[in-house]
Regions:
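N-terminal signal peptide c-region/cleavage motif recognized by signal peptidases
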Residues: 20-22
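Extracytosolic ligand-binding ectodomains
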Residues: 2-10, 25-414
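Secretory targeting signals
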Residues: 1-3, 15-16
Length: 414
């Protein structure tokens, strides 16, 4: 059952003892907690995330001539020019470690807000702790649809979720079919955490609704040492489109195993995650010419909005990489949160929450191809329009929707 915030009654007396001293009227700095995997198999995600958040913090704390919230002027004008200070925490891709780190950030580091977390499974526990302490949590890059449907008052997500992303995929399939492409059967391949499960559920529902046949629906254990049996099943099913929902390590293993077993599908349309990461293409990019991934961000937007390219160069100077689907959402996560804190003119959790609820940021004032940032009563931004990107010649180009596309899709993939 979907729970809205109107259904939730939080007893002030019961929770008052848990609220940290975050109601200081004026402060020289605003401390925001950032929780990501900084060690383990997903560590590179966390390292890149640090650079994205540091880029956003630099833009906020210094003066830049960009049409972006908080770029002009130094610091948060609503708090007397207070600077943003980030405190990073390592959840090690472990939901329980994430829970502990969130509590440490709130009770010891005295953060007024938390942003995270890459893995949706970690966002579940982190957001629960933030709710308990009445501290706003912003899912910068978590995409599981169920996250915003738990009735949490302090949960917000500016980016699309996997139902929105999957709808874009099926809109693309429909458009391709109208153009003469043969797309009738699908194979789903997904890991067994909340990310993979929610993604597969969304795709299954859309396939039924749009008249596509799922000939294989394969769930595997995340971080499996072998995917040979699963790839044999995919090869036997021989669907028109393979739709993987896998993080980077699993994605690399999937592609290597497909090559070893001689399985080359006509098309791969991926639910992002590992398939948007440079590490995957560094490892197996030679086998993925023409792969399609959904996304929130396209560097092609810089042609229409020059500040996107300039901010990308700021990030690249720190990271050695261009923005991708994750780092762009992480950057915007801090901009959205800091903008709310600035409008709240406070580091009190409830006042920041109220400012987040009132957010209405035009898409032109972001680095994303979104209409705007405006949250519904469950904390979801429904105006974050996805795009589809195709990997061609060592880079991604936007192929869908038509109003954002800079190239025609290559179908089938090479």
């Amino acid at each position: 059952m979907t729970i809205t915030r109107r259904d939730v009654l939080l007893g002030a007396a019961a929770t008052a003892a848990l609220v940290p001293l975050a109601a200081r009227a004026q402060t020289s700095e605003v401390v925001i907690g950032v929780i990501y995997p900084l060690s383990g198999s997903s560590a590179q995600i966390g390292v890149d995330a640090q650079k994205a958040f540091e880029t956003a913090a630099e833009l906020i704390n210094k003066n830049y001539d960009f049409d972006l919230p908080l770029a002009k002027g130094e610091g948060l004008s609503g708090l007397g020019g207070a600077k943003v200070r980030l405190v990073f925490a390592d959840h090690q891709a472990d939901p329980q470690k994430g829970r502990a780190e969130a509590e440490r950030l709130i009770t010891q580091e005295k953060v007024c807000a938390v942003i995270g977390t890459y893995q949706s499974a970690v966002a579940v526990t982190v957001s629960q702790i933030c709710e308990r302490y009445q501290i706003p949590f912003l899912s910068a890059d978590n995409s599981s649809p169920s996250l915003h449907r738990r009735g949490l008052k302090y949960y917000f997500r500016a980016a699309p979720h996997d139902e929105m992303f999957s709808k874009a995929m099926f809109d693309f399939f429909d458009a391709q079919k109208k153009g003469g492409a043969k797309i009738e059967t699908l194979s789903l391949f997904h890991e067994d955490t909340i990310f993979g499960t929610d993604s597969a559920n969304a795709q299954t529902a859309l396939a039924k609704e749009r008249g596509y046949k799922i000939v294989a629906d394969i769930k595997y254990r995340a971080n499996s040492p072998s995917l040979s049996a699963e790839v044999q099943q995919l090869k036997a099913a021989n669907a028109d489109v393979l739709m993987p929902s896998s993080y980077t390590t699993d994605g690399i293993l999937l592609v290597k195993t497909m090559a070893e077993l001689g399985y080359k599908p006509n098309a791969i349309v991926a639910q992002d995650a590992g398939f948007s990461e440079k590490a995957l293409y560094d490892a197996v990019g030679d086998k993925l010419e023409g792969v399609i991934s959904r996304g929130s961000f396209s560097l092609d937007l810089a042609e229409k909005r020059p500040m996107v390219g300039k901010i990308n160069e700021m990030f690249k100077a720190k990271s050695g990489k261009d923005f991708n689907d994750y780092s762009s959402r992480q950057f915007m996560g801090l901009i959205v949160m800091a903008d709310a804190i600035n409008r709240a003119k406070s580091i009190d959790g409830e006042k920041i929450r109220e400012a987040l609820v009132a957010t209405d940021m035009p898409g032109e004032q972001t680095i994303m191809p979104w209409k705007r940032v405006k949250f519904d009563d469950m904390g979801q931004n429904n105006d974050a329009d996805p795009v589809l990107l195709q990997y061609v010649g060592g880079k991604f180009v936007t192929i869908f929707p038509s109003q954002a596309a800079v190239a025609k899709p290559i179908w089938p993939m090479k």
